């Protein structure tokens, strides 16, 4: 598993509970840095497990230099300072909670580009559906999605842009380790299929945020910067495999569908 993280592409550690995923991730991060294959690893773990994760990491590497977040670090008055510590510090690993990870935004420009890409794909799908007989429901569904994305884009463009916000791109992170990655399974999805059990087209903001950050890491690492770990990669929905493909390979949704 460690060798795959070092020399392969984006990795999914889908071992059962107790199999040693935490140690695999810690060893991977330390070896990546020792070999000069990455500069900074960010561990995103369940909020209540940040200290436990740090303890496990130090049990394997007692002299590792870690930066571990606390609840106070992401309070409004402290967030910028903590993000600056991530950006300027030389750490073997930075460990933060899931909800704290969401509070570190991608740049507005990158968010706008991702939304526009989704809108372009929907526009193409609408034209294809209009050309086919009996796809009236699909067209309506896609137009609803397009409207929702337009509103999202308009809100983003109208938001105040503060120059002092530290964005995810500015952290200097080039490896992302995500524990309990099944929490990010509800991703943007459009499909012609209807009345299929377990087929959900709803999207969670945290999943959308994760997708954008994975896309960024793919760009700067050549598709080697994302390592997910979970004991339940697919639990109860047929769309979860689709989501995995999007997060780990980052093609367009239409490429995956084809």
What are these model-derived regions, one by one?
Residues 1-12:
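Conserved pre-motif I regulatory segment
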Residues 9-11, 92, 174-175, 225:
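The start of beta-strands in P-loop NTPase/AAA+ ATPase cores
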Residues 16:
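P-loop (Walker A) phosphate-binding loop of NTP-binding proteins
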Residues 19-214, 237, 254:
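SF2 helicase/translocase NTPase motor core
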Residues 224-235:
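Conserved helicase ATPase motor motifs in RecA-like P-loop NTPase domains
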Residues 238-244:
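Short regulatory helix/loop adjacent to the ATP-binding pocket of P-loop NTPases
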Residues 248-258:
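Single conserved hydrophobic/aromatic residue that forms the stacking wall/gate
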């Amino acid at each position: 598993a460690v060798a795959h993280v070092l020399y392969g592409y984006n990795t999914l550690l889908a071992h059962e509970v107790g199999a040693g995923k935490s140690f695999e991730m810690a060893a991977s991060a330390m070896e990546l840095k020792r070999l000069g294959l990455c500069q900074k690893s960010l561990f995103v773990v369940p909020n209540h497990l940040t200290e436990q994760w740090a303890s496990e990491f130090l049990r394997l590497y007692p002299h590792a230099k870690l930066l571990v977040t606390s609840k106070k670090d992401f309070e409004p008055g402290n967030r910028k300072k903590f993000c600056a510590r991530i950006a300027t510090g030389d750490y073997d690993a930075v460990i933060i909670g899931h909800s704290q990870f969401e509070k570190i935004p991608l740049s507005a420009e990158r968010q706008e580009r991702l939304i526009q890409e989704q809108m372009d794909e929907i526009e193409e799908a609408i034209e294809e559906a209009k050309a086919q007989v009996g796809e009236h429901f699909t067209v309506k569904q896609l137009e609803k999605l397009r409207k929702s994305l337009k509103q999202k884009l308009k809100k983003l463009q109208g938001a105040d842009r503060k120059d002092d916000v530290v964005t995810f791109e500015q952290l200097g992170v080039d490896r992302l380790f995500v524990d309990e990655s099944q929490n990010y399974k509800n991703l943007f999805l459009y499909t012609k299929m209807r009345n299929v059990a377990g087929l959900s087209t709803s999207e969670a903001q945290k999943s959308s945020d994760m997708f954008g950050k994975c896309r960024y890491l793919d760009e700067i690492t050549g598709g080697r910067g994302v390592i997910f770990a979970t004991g339940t990669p697919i639990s109860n929905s047929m769309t979860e495999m689709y989501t995995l493909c999007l997060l780990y390979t980052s093609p367009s949704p239409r490429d995956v569908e084809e």
